[in-house]
Structure formats: C-alpha cells, structure tokens
Amino acid sequence: MGRKNLVEFFHDYFSPRSNYLEYDNGFRRWSYAYCETAEAARVFAARLKAAGVRRGERVLLWSESRPEWVFAFWGSLLAGAVVVPVGAESSSEFVSRVADVARPRVVALGEDVRLDAEVSAQVLRLAREDWKGPSNALESPAVTRDDLAEIVFTSGSTGEPKGVEITHGNLLSQIEAVELWMVRIRKFLRPFFPIRLLQLLPLSHMFGQAAALSLAPLTRASVVMTRRQNPAALAELIRTRGVCSVVCVPRVLDAFRALASQQIRTEPRPSGSGPSAWQPEALVRNLWRARHIRRTFGWRFLGFVVGGAALDPELERFWSRLGYLVVQGYGLTETSPVISLNNPLHPRAGSVGQLFPGVKARIAPDGEILVRGPNVSRGYYNEPERTFDAMRDGWLHTGDLGSLDEEGYLYIRGRKKEMIVTPEGVNIFPEDVERVLDGVSGVRESAVVGLPLLGDDRQEHVHAVLELAPGRDAGEVMAEANRRLESYQRIRGVFVWPEEALPRTGQTGKLKRAEIRDRIAAERAAKPVNGHPARGSTTADMVTEEIERRTGRGASAESSLDELGLSSVDRVEMLLEFEGRSGQSMEESEFAAARTVGDLKAAVERAVKSGEPGAAERARFPSWNRNSLARLVRETNLSLWVLPLARFLGRPTVEGLQNLNRVKPPVIFAANHESNLDAPLILAALPGEWRRRIAPAMYKEFFDPHFSPENYSLTRKLLSSIVYYLIALIGNAFPIPQEEAGVRDVLRYAGELVSEGWSLLIFPEGERRPADRHGAFRPGVGLLADRLEVPVVPVCVEGTGQVLPPQRVLPRRGRTRVIFGPPMRLEDRDPKVLAKQVQEAVASLAAAGFASLARR
C-alpha cells in the first residue's frame, strides 16, 4: 500500500515460484513462473540500460500477446522507461506515425508484425531475445507516482494517433483498490486454486493489461495466452488447461454461444436468468441441464470477464441461464482503464456494475457520463488542446451515454457521437436497432448508421448495413426487423456489405461506424435495399489470393493443385490459415482429397457456410504410453534386451555427443533412414537422460489394419494391433501419416509431447533408402520445427542397411555409425526451405563420416 511506483508492486508480487504465464501457439505450450518472469524482466532492463535508455525515454512494444511482451513491459519500467504499447493488428504506417510522435529509443517487435518503415531506434525481436543473462545489482531510477508509465496510442477522429498518458499513480490507484478487496475475499477463492485466466484481450489494450499484469498477480493466478481463434479449439484449451475464467470482448461470448447451442439443441432449455439463476435450486437445475456444455468447457470453468465493448443483454442472459458468471466492466483507456465493474458475487444483469473505489461519476444533462478520480489520465501526449476539450471542468467527458440507478449501478445507453437524431428530434441508439437485426434469421452481422435519404442530404435517417447468409434477401430482413421495432426506430434504407465481415477495431471488436458510414456514403451508387446483390464470393477470393501468393501464378477453378506445385505441406498450411481467418474448423480429409482449386474453394465455403465452429474428430494417438507404469515397462525392456540386442547387431561407433551439450531438450532429432534398426541404434547411442525423454515417429500406413480394420481380416487386424501397441509401449512411438490428411493432428500431438519436455525422433525421407541413394527430406520436418519452435539436431546413421536391409527379415551383424550434428535453429518460415537445410546438414555428416573412414 502507498507504493511510490509500479516497480515496488513488481518486487512485492513477482517472486513466487508458482506458474504465472502460459503460452499456447496452437501446437505446443510454454510456461513461466513469477520468479522466471522477474528474472527475464531484469535481463531486459539491463539490456535497455546497456543500449543507453534513460529515465522517461520511450520503448515501443508492437507485438502479439506473448510472455515476452510481459517481460519487456516490466523490464522497461524497471529501467525507468515509458512503455508505448501498440496492437499487433496495427498497420506499419500507423506504427510509423506513432514512432514519429513518441520518438522511442527502442522498438520491440513480435513475430506476427513487420516494420516496413525506417525508425530512428534500436529494433529488437522479442521472440529471438536471450532472456537469460546478466541482471545482477540492477538499480531502478527514482520514479514517482506522477511519472509516466505508458503512452497508449489510439486513432483519433482525424485518423492521426492520439497518445493517452498513463502514470504510475493512475495504475497504482486501481491496483491498490483491488488489493484491499482481495484481502476480504481471498478465503473464498481458495477452493478454486490454482486460478487460471484465459487472456483473449490483447496486452496492448488497457483492460487486457489490468487482467494479466495486475489482477493475476494479486490473486496468484496463471495467465494463459494463445494464438488459437477457433471457438472449438479455445473450448478445448479451456477444458484441458483447467481455465476458470475467460477475459474477452463480447464477440467471444457470441462465438462460444454458437458452439454451446450445438450441445443444447436436444436438451431442455435452461430456465432462469440474471441473479435468480444463481439461487441454489435454479443453479442445480441449470448445472444439470447444461452438463453437456460443462463437459465441453470443463467443470473448473466459471464464466467470463467482459470489457471493451457493450454486451448484448440477451447474450448475458444466455450464459447466466446456463449457470455461468458474466462479469461486465466498463472503462476507457483514459481511465486506466476501469470505471465500474460488476461484483462477481452479486452481478446486476444489464449493468456494467458499480463505480470502482476512488472513481466518481455523474450524468450530464445530455446523458453523457462524466468521470474523475486518481485513475483518470492527465491528458494526451503533446496535445494540450485535445486534453482541455476532454477534461473540461475537472471531469473526463467519456463520450458515452448512460444512467446511474439508486444503488449506484451504471448502465450504458450508447455512444454520444454515434447517436442518430431523426428529423422528428428523436434520439436513436444504433445498438438498440442492431440488437433486433441480429435476431433476424440470416443476419450474421449488422451495423446501424445515420444517413440521409437519397435526394435529401439534410436529415439523418436510420440505415442498416448487413452481412447476410447466402441467399438471404436484404429487403425481407428490413421488413421483418421493422415489424419488431418501435415506429420511431424503423429502418429507412439497407445495404449489403460487400466483404467478408464488417470492419471492427482489432483490439476490442467495436464496430468502426464512421468508416462504414463514410464508405456507404461514398459508394451511394450501390443499390440500397431490394435487389442489392448478396455478398460476393469472398471466400473463393481468399483461396485464390492465397494460392497466387504461394505459387506466384494465376489460378482458375480448374487449375490442378499438383501442376501449381502445391505440396501436401502447402495444403496443411493453407488449412491452418483458413481456419484462423474464418473461425471455423475444416475437414482435413477434404483438403487432402482436393485435386483442383475449385475443390479447395468448395471445401472452404462448406465450412464457412455451415457456421458450425465444432472441431473435427481428432486422430487416435497414444497417451497411455507416457504414464508411470508404461515408462517403467519401457525402461525395463530397453535395458534388458532391446538396446543390448541393437548394440550386439550393429556394433555402433557414436560420434558428436558433445553437440548435445549445446542444447537443452526438447529438440527434434532428424535422421536419414536405411533400416528398421535405425531407431533402436539411435536410442542406444543417446545418453540415458535423453533416451528416457524421446518419442520416435513410426509409419502410420504400416499399421493400416489397426487404424482401418474394416478392410482387413480378423487375423491381420489382431496382428497389426499387437505390433502397434508393443512398439508404442516399448519404443514410446507415435504414428505419422505419409499423406497430408492427419498432419494437423500430428502437429498438435507433437506439440503436446514437446510441451511435456519430450524430444522427437523423425525420419524425414519417409521411407527406407540405401546408403548411396538417400531421398529428399519431406517438408514435414520444417513444418514441425517452425510450428513447435524447437531446434533440430541432424543425425546420420550409416551401415544399418547392411545389418537389416529392407528386404530381409533376419538381421546379420555388422558395423554401424551414429553421428550427431550441431543443433540447428531454423528461422525461415518456408517448410520446404527448412527441410532442405536439415537434409544438407545430414548429408554433410555423412560426407564427414566417409572421409573419416577413408582416413582410417
């Protein structure tokens, strides 16, 4: 309490060894304790000081949400610098304009951004930084509560960035208020430990920072960050990681509602809503009726913390009826960020809660919410006129319209500047009309703006801009909505948006109404309402553009994928890209079966039109072979007969083991493939600490009778299953398909292994080859290395083809050699290029091995 700056809060809360940050890139997972975060932050602070960064100088963070963002944020504050966070979705041009205003000394970039413009600052890549290094005896500058901690830039009404000044005192006022509250409720949280928050708001957003950087340390919670966007994949992450709450914008709740609705179509609809849903009798009833949804999200999941945009009351009621908490908050960047928050133990439906401790608010005569308090920013960076306009009479003019009830609960009506004033002088709130439109069948998204009627440029009328399902008529939608609206709210004109989705802000998902209104006004020649063509084939365009980007050639629907040079890995990468952009799961088998561009377009369009976010069935992979009993059986068999037999038959010479001292597991061992003896000999050559944590890949199609038993006799099925389970048990092996179907699931399973600390052993040739005719390495090794972000250790095996050639059943003794090369950290994103690099590394080991033999 009474801290001088945020650095003191950091020292108070970032010493435990408990888990703090988890990062899931869609395939593998990383985790960092509070103390590891503190050490990484100190390393970054030392690096900034070595670069000459002084107190008050700016560090621009332009990155996706990832642990390194948190390291850099706290490291910047430890160095006395001012953080300038910019969302990963921002354009390079916007970042360049921000840099012109803020003049940062250092620019730290994430993996998903590309800075095209020149900046007069040192540029760092967060994911490539070494977060272990000298940080001892680091002294932070004497920063006070009045010093700037952040400058948060948003796009102003003129399109030019405006920087909101956030001081250490602004942030501490909110932290210390929560800290006092936590003292009272900590005992109630103990049954839910360990608390895990899924952070779906970007860290460049102030509400996202409040959850990850303030609330989580105060509750000793873990923060899970992810690159996943598909609702089904997110639900799987919530269930498997034991997430208690999701921090998000309302659009995420809407996406999850579509997923949950699939589970309750055949179930009685849960009854009750709002506070009554949390009465004991209603709660038990709702939990039972929503049991299928509970299995989808996991039984530890309690609900959502929502901010950044207005929440539809019906959406809130939907989740409350199912027994989930929906805690809604309200705030602005200028208020650091929280103005009000619903008490999770006493939520008020439809309200954004009561005022945060220390915050004062009043409603102006025109309905605008005015705020003041220690959390309110002192103004805009280098813009005194804009500061004066927003902070008149000591009150921050929020631009939002609302009301306060007798108990102090705040309700939001809409945005003042977005309100439509009809010719009759009636105020129309766009959100009210959008709520009705969104309830009309076939409406995927809607935006309501004020526009004059054709031929009359003086008065605004209500116009709707729609994103419709294929075949839905805009005129019919308007007529149906008008039947539900009050007479003064009725829509006078409607337009069909010609693109995939309505434009929204990247961080909070708010509609960009000004952009929508300006574009419709500029393209007024487009037919309004009836007869306006529905959305064009934007999904098909997306496929065409992606193919042309990868091949550099034009493509028609009849173009052959093979003739275009699209490999199986290209198709897998396109599948992952389309899933991320559409938010829908797609059948990998359809992608694998596609032969033309038209086939691919049809597969993508079927997934998008279905609107179903459900995940495809996961392939079968062994997890039982990693339990304690299986590991004991494996170690016993390997030690007693498997490895001694391999050493007896192969009499191996092992070279290059010293290269393993240069890397820590997990890694990918990539080897040439001459014989079925290769994997046992490599295991025999490895030191025990490596051998005990390795998972070799095996040829899935070899076990086709096990995986596709309907095509084989009972004898072949039984024999195949016995061999499969024996190899999976004794070798800890897992199946990899040779075709592209199933590659996505292989990536995810390999990610699970790597996340648990297991190294992988793969044979990128995909088949056994003679020593003098090694095959080309398939791009899968590059895809694994890129997506799992692990080093590759090249391995050359020689002589096994003489001991156990492919055509022989019984081996004969011989001499073999196993050579481990230096670890490779692959940075190119093209899997084919990466695979070629690994192939060349293995070939160089083979050449060195032959030269060594010649010298002997």
What are these regions (language model features)?
Residues A447-G450, N482-A534:
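Conserved C-terminal "lid"/linker of ANL adenylate-forming enzymes
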Residues L172-R196, L203-R291, R300:
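Conserved AMP-binding/adenylation subdomain of ANL enzymes
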Residues V107, I363, G373, R378-G379, ...:
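AMP-binding/adenylate-forming catalytic core of the ANL superfamily
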Residues F73, A88-D116, W131-S135, Q174-L198, ...:
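Conserved ATP-dependent adenylate/AMP-binding module captured primarily in the ANL superfamily
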Residues L21-R66, V70-W74, S91-S96, D100, ...:
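Conserved AMP-binding/adenylate-forming core of the ANL superfamily
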Residues A474-G475, A521, E740-R856:
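Non-catalytic C-terminal accessory region of glycerolipid acyltransferases
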Residues S31-Y34, A149-E176:
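Conserved AMP-binding A3 loop
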